[in-house]
Amino acid sequence: MTFQAIATHPQDWTGDTLALGLTTAAIGETLSSELQKLDQQWNGVLQELISDSEFKAKLAETTTTRIGGSIRKLILVGLGESPTTEDYRRAAAAVAKQARSFKSQTLAIAFPPSDDPAAIASAIVEGISLALYKDQRFKSEPDTASGPSSIELLGLAGQEAAIARAEQVVAGVELARQLVAAPANVVTPVTMADTAQELAAELGLELEILEADECEKRGMGAFLGVAKASDLPPKFIHLTYRPESTPRRKLAIVGKGLTFDSGGYNIKGAGSGIEMMKTDMGGAAATLGAAKAIGLIKPDVEVHFISAVTENMISGRGMHPGDILTASNGKTIEVNNTDAEGRLTLADALVFADGLGVDAIVDLATLTGACIIALGDDIAGLWSPSDDLAEQLLQAGKAAGEKLWRLPLEEPYLDGLKSPVADYKNTGPRAGGSITAALFLKQFVKHPVWAHLDVAGPVWSDKEKHYNPAGATGYGVRTLVNWVLS
């Protein structure tokens, strides 16, 4: 699938399928003057289609017809009243799915002129590419139906750089989707390390992988406490992108990397969704996806991508409820629930990131069911002691169409994590569980410019939503890239 930005007007384009994006104002009591010209050329087909289909130009609403001549199909897609970048993305996705159903080989898409044509071009590329993504790796008879092979963005000549950047971001999202969607017998800690090695070789990134013995030397008792039950070796991954010039800032991104979570001795029971615990490395997947995108884009920012990767299993070597672990900053943790393991692995990863001398740290993790209860499946939670960093991430997420909601770091709640035998317990009371989880992580970060994203809900969708097919969404990659580039 190739994208090309051209100056051609819709009335002069020829090919399989032409899509026009229309606002509600453009089809008011009378068509806009621009649409009237097209309607005259097409012998009234446009007005007839709008009237007969009762098309109202609601966001992502579509209607189609044949118009004959040099164009086989016409798609009208609604943009709503005052379209945002996310609206353009969703409208483009709706067009892509229609064009695929028509088996169109060539597609042109024309949206109304804007004072930010680069944003529109990027939104079209992201919306179409992400909507048409298919993961057929594990099918014995893969579905070979694909979308158009050639897509032209009309009226957007000169936006080649925006198209290229959007394709680079999409490549990162697709990597994250593939990692999250694959089962735990395919994506293991070793697989994640191999993926990091491939990225390093492909993109010229620096790579450090700490094996268990090196992690032990560094005092990573919290991470290794989780890892010791698994027969698969843990991998502590540290990828670094360094620009050729002096970086304008240095950042660290830390992703939770549990390739499977059984719950340990606090095992997940029937109805717990244990079969979906392959997704518990969604934070690490987004981290590697962001590494791919950043490595392709090559901004003037130094970025460290970190993940402590392991499984949480059950064996004679496994940690017991009540065990006390010592993290690499010397803090001791009473494990009162082995199924709250992600925060243990993150503890040592955050201590590591904190020692890199970066300007800001962001971690993201499929950390708590409590966050899903609070915010639902589509919104990630955001905690940060830094108002500036929180606002940067909120704006980055808004531009990406990835929803974030800031929640409080309510310090008095930390009392619920106090242990009579260690510095902290790894879980507190049921109430405010996502907040106490964030407060737990805060004990392992001295840096004041830190944020925690709980992405437990949006990394996976059971049904198709806009440009996200059912399954892994790749959530977080586009927000992280926007943040790095901001």
From Swiss-Prot:
Q: Per UniProt, what is one Pfam family of this protein?
A: Peptidase_M17_N
Q: One GO MF term, please?
A: manganese ion binding
Entry's cofactor comment: Binds 2 manganese ions per subunit.
Q: Name the reaction it catalyses.
A: Release of an N-terminal amino acid, Xaa-|-Yaa-, in which Xaa is preferably Leu, but may be other amino acids including Pro although not Arg or Lys, and Yaa may be Pro. Amino acid amides and methyl esters are also readily hydrolyzed, but rates on arylamides are exceedingly low; Release of an N-terminal amino acid, preferentially leucine, but not glutamic or aspartic acids
Name the SUPFAM superfamilies for this protein.
Macro domain-like, Zn-dependent exopeptidases
Q: Name one GO biological process term.
A: proteolysis
Broadest EC class assigned to this enzyme: hydrolase
Per UniProt, the keywords (alphabetical) are:
Aminopeptidase, Cytoplasm, Hydrolase, Manganese, Protease
Where is the protein found, in the record's own terms?
Cytoplasm
Required cofactor names: Mn(2+)
Keyword Cytoplasm annotated: yes
Q: What are its E.C. numbers?
A: 3.4.11.1, 3.4.11.10
Q: Which GO terms describe its cellular component?
A: cytoplasm
Source superkingdom:
Bacteria
Major localization listed first in the record, in broad terms: cytoplasm
Q: Which PROSITE patterns match?
A: CYTOSOL_AP
Asked whether the keyword Lipoprotein is assigned, the reply is no
- Similarity field: Belongs to the peptidase M17 family.
What exactly does this protein do?
Presumably involved in the processing and regular turnover of intracellular proteins. Catalyzes the removal of unsubstituted N-terminal amino acids from various peptides.
This chain belongs to the protein called: Probable cytosol aminopeptidase
- Recorded source organism is Synechococcus elongatus (strain ATCC 33912 / PCC 7942 / FACHB-805) (Anacystis nidulans R2)
Species classification: Bacteria, Bacillati, Cyanobacteriota, Cyanophyceae, Synechococcales
Gene that specifies this protein:
pepA
